[in-house]
Amino acid sequence: SIAAVALAAAGVLSARSVMQAPAPGEGEKKLIDLKSDLMGPVAPGDSVVFLVGNFAAQHNGAVITCDSAVRYSDMRIEFFGNVLINKNTTYIYGDRAEYDGDVNEARVYSDIIKVVDGDATLYTYKFLFNTKSNVGEFDDGGVMLNRENLLESVRGYYYADTKELIAVDRVEMRNDEYELKGDSVVYDMTTDNAFFFEHTNIWNKDGDYLYADRGAYDKLDTLYI
């Protein structure tokens, strides 16, 4: 199960500098900071506001830029065109995004969404990212490329702080040393080590085959434990 896997796994700089908001008091919810060249109501007397031109938003330390945006309320915004969400080393690229500041979640949409973190790049179609926990997820198929490694799965959970990807459901992972197929894998993006769970088939470059329900691949020593 996902819970078991999780337990086992144990150009934006200017926008960021412009929007330094004071820290909220204890128990106070931090609002979304916004800036743009132009803004105005979508319709006369409407509280919904359209923003365009050098737009940027900031919340929980994440900076979001795009071509234009619509603010529906103080905590709910929709972004259009060349959307970029950046927090620390994570960069998320898409065509459109919806952000709900009450739950700290950005839902990103595009024909192909790209999530870049150092050498690792994740490609998917829909991506949910929490700007407070720094955890993202996809459930419609995703592919991660990291140096010589390729990892595919139907669902996945990206942990920006620990540099891990939990891949779930029809997982395939391969590089020059081995190919792995299984139900779930925890992949360390820094070390390239992988922890696998349940119904895992592994073939190495020499043609050797291994089946396991639980184990680990150590990149440094090329060991299957």
What do these predicted regions represent?
Residues 1-11:
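Bacterial N-terminal signal peptides
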